[in-house]
Amino acid sequence: MIKVAVTGAAGRMGSGIIRKITQQDDMEVVAAIEIPNSPLAGVDAGIQAGAGELGVKIVGAEKLEETLKESKADVLVDFTIAHAAVETVKKATACGVNVVVGTTGFTDEQMAENIKNVKDNDVKAVISSNMSIGVNVFFNTLKKLTPILNDFDIEIIEAHHNQKKDAPSGTAMTAFEVIANELDRDPEEVGVYGRQGMVGKRTKEEIGLHAIRGGDIVGDHTVMFIGDGERIEFTHRAHTREVFIAGVIRAIRYIPDAESGIVSSMNDVLGLE
């Protein structure tokens, strides 16, 4: 039985993950963590998530380390915000707890810190900007398509709900990095984030990224390969957060077989090249 701790336990993703874990035969929720000094502290995590009573009380993040030790968690799952997640990963790995992280918006420095903490504490980890199985097939297909369409102009468009805080999305940034890498282009030099005013003629090297926010859009990502007289639009649409949660469950199950001291990706989880 895999013992799982969930941060952001009262959020949309955290609650969904808790509900899904209660439906599995090989894992259980042993800890539920919310923001420091959360007003929900003491509330049963299962009741809060709509999964029925679990006997696991929500605690504030100020008690993270003692909670992980007392619960003997095998894996911590984090879907929160970047600056909080970095601290969570640091503390969890120091406690010898493996991590599955779907939080987005990490800076290069924050991601480097995550990688260092996983390595220094020799724990197992899966960190991905998008846990959806379909999106990771999307990334894998982009990797194969891009060299073939290397002479096309490339634009990335993403759309999310009006509560999303970071832009462009982590998924759009991953797609951008996959494309730039396949074309041997420096992301720092070729990324163009929206356009306004007299920006001049589009260069052949640039890759555009555009963010739309509105309503309850779960997550749409389109990569346009635009040539003279034709274009290819490659799109992934998430209709429900359940697609991300299904990927989280796969990632949790992968952890026991993962290599220690390195950060695995969803490619590793899914066995993609």
Swiss-Prot record:
Location within or outside the cell: Cytoplasm
One Pfam family from the record: DapB_C
Stated family: Belongs to the DapB family.
Key words of the record: Amino-acid biosynthesis, Cytoplasm, Diaminopimelate biosynthesis, Lysine biosynthesis, NAD, NADP, Oxidoreductase
Domain of life, per lineage: Archaea
Role of this protein: Catalyzes the conversion of 4-hydroxy-tetrahydrodipicolinate (HTPA) to tetrahydrodipicolinate.
Signal peptide segment: none
Protein residues bound to NAD(+): G8, A9, A10, G11, R12, M13, E34, G102, T103, T104, S128, S129, N130, M131
Pathway per the UniProt entry: Amino-acid biosynthesis; L-lysine biosynthesis via DAP pathway; (S)-tetrahydrodipicolinate from L-aspartate: step 4/4
PROSITE patterns, per database record: DAPB
Catalytic activity: (S)-2,3,4,5-tetrahydrodipicolinate + NAD(+) + H2O = (2S,4S)-4-hydroxy-2,3,4,5-tetrahydrodipicolinate + NADH + H(+); (S)-2,3,4,5-tetrahydrodipicolinate + NADP(+) + H2O = (2S,4S)-4-hydroxy-2,3,4,5-tetrahydrodipicolinate + NADPH + H(+)
Stated name of the protein: 4-hydroxy-tetrahydrodipicolinate reductase
Coarse class of the protein's main subcellular location: cytoplasm
CDD domains: DHDPR_N
Enzyme Commission designation: 1.17.1.8
Active site: H160, K164
InterPro entries assigned: DapB_C, DapB_N, DapB_N_CS, DHDPR_bac, NAD(P)-bd_dom_sf
Highest classification ranks of the organism: Archaea, Methanobacteriati, Methanobacteriota, Methanomada group, Methanobacteria
